[in-house]
Amino acid sequence: MTITGQINSETLNNGVPIFAPPYRWSKHWPRFTDVNCITIRYRTDGSSIRQYIPDNLQIEETPIVTIMLLDFGFSVIGPYHELIHCVEVTYEGKKYNYSFLLILDNEEACIGGRELLGNPKVLGTIEFDRQNRPPTAFIHGRVLRPSNTVIADIHFKPLCLVLDAGESKTPITGLNLRLIPSLIPGAPPSVREYTNVDFTLQGGEVWEGVGSLNFPSNSEFEPLHKFPVLEYLSATYHRGAWVEQRLLNVYSF
């Protein structure tokens, strides 16, 4: 005699393990509050990074790179820190910020971002504590992976307040490669698509200033050093903002 399980297999639509999914599908895209963020934009050497870019994307000879260091104060998956590293590309005539590497310290955010949106997220150690600052104007954070190896140092020095609460809105139009290989040798991937995701910082204070980046590690596993700084373009610090993220489109190829 056998009995069947009680979970409806035709309506399963969450992550695994199914008895405690790390995220749940919802019609409401996640929001994050009490967010602090350093954003630095710079130009890099296209010939140095083209080896990391799919051939259906185009980049300039000196493409724009955006690096963001975030302190998410609160969300449905709790507080955490994250480094976002992306490069400007063109896909089918439109410009996007192609996600190269995201490092964070929250397991649920890592799993959900990878599986749902194709974000290239990995776990790491991020030191970006708003309460523990040196007695100077500098705001500093650093990223370690593995935990004893610094791969990125980020500095920001504020110069002026440019927008007050409620007026600021900074959208980042992202493009992620969502790729799930097939288990069958020689078969095409089970999933291969680009996801177009809007990531918007809103509200709070926006400070303009001077940014400085250093990538001290030469690791081939996290090759941030292959994105050298040729020219700094801008540096800002969002304080007490909130973030909204939503899917705009999916492009299969």
UniProtKB/Swiss-Prot annotation:
The active site is at 121 (schiff-base intermediate with acetoacetate). It comes from the Eukaryota. Coiled coil: none annotated. GO terms for molecular function: carboxy-lyase activity. Disruption phenotype: Leads to the loss of T-Toxin production, resulting in low virulence for maize. Belongs to the ADC family. Decarboxylase; part of the Tox1B locus, one of the 2 loci that mediate the biosynthesis of T-toxin, a family of linear polyketides 37 to 45 carbons in length, of which the major component is 41 carbons, and which leads to high virulence to maize. One of the PKSs (PKS1 or PKS2) could synthesize a precursor, used subsequently by the other PKS as starter unit, to add additional carbons. This is Decarboxylase DEC1.
